[in-house]
Amino acid sequence: DVLIVDDVQECDRAMKFYNALCPYYQNNMIEIRQSEPYSYCQFVVGRDHTAFGRARHPFMTGSGGWAYFSATGYMLGIRPDFEHLTIDPCIPADWKEFSAVRRWRGAEYDIHVENPDGVMKGVQELYLDGEKVERIPVMAQGSRHDVRVVMG
């Protein structure tokens, strides 16, 4: 399960699972898959069937939503709750940085995560608009903020 990434060693494994399920990485068999190259499908026909490998019902599944939820909330680690925006990535060690934009409660957060030591999990420093903070609170609607995260 991609959502369960609470152990540091699971971060690389979660990325491998995510990539295995990602439609982009299945484009090398598009003639067999016979589905849009960008869509998650409800099911893929099993090996005992004559249509083995074909993907069906691309827009009748919750897989796309769950893939987004898993990737943004648990791998990139950007999770809103009632009072705070948590950023706690669980990424492959070879990712040196990534950026994301998150709109939450009417405010926009430009998030840049740095990983100078090549760790898979652990936030060393968190900055909101250049000021070191412990947590990111709800900000005013219509406002825009820079968030810098240093892993380590």
Report the location of each language-model feature.
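Non-catalytic C-terminal accessory modules of carbohydrate-active enzymes
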Residues: 2-152
